[in-house]
């Protein structure tokens, strides 16, 4: 589980640019696609954000609402085969209450079939805009 966050102001100039500007925090644990592919739609994603000092539910839902990995890989410019060790972001759920900045982000991916959960969190330091 990881975060593909962006710089919202930079998004006005280009989504790819805004994504390249931000690091991608990723859980130190992972699951192989082969371990979850047969029940992908049942996986549950949840995120909390600390906004103005309050921890709030930010995103929640099943991966059934996202494109399956095989579909995304088939659309890949280099073809569907990914090099060993590749990590791929597969989309995101809508932000409950809309996108808003926060001081902390916590995320989890729960596998109800195998009874396990990946978790990760990070703090956000907003940099001042200087000219």
Which residues make up each language-model segment?
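Catalytic-core "active-site belt" of small-molecule-metabolizing enzymes
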Residues: 1-87, 94-131
């Amino acid at each position: 589980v990881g975060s593909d966050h962006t710089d919202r102001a930079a998004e006005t100039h280009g989504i790819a640019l805004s994504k390249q500007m931000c690091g991608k925090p990723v859980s130190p644990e992972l699951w192989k696609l082969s371990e979850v592919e047969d029940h992908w739609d049942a996986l549950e994603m949840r995120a909390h954000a600390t906004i103005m000092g309050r921890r709030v539910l930010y995103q929640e839902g099943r991966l059934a609402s996202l494109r399956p990995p095989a579909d995304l890989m088939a659309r890949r410019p280099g073809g569907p085969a990914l090099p060993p060790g590749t990590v791929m972001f597969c989309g995101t759920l809508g932000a409950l209450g809309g996108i808003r900045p926060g001081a902390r982000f916590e995320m989890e991916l729960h596998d109800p079939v195998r009874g396990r959960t990946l978790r990760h969190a990070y703090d956000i330091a907003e940099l001042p805009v200087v000219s």
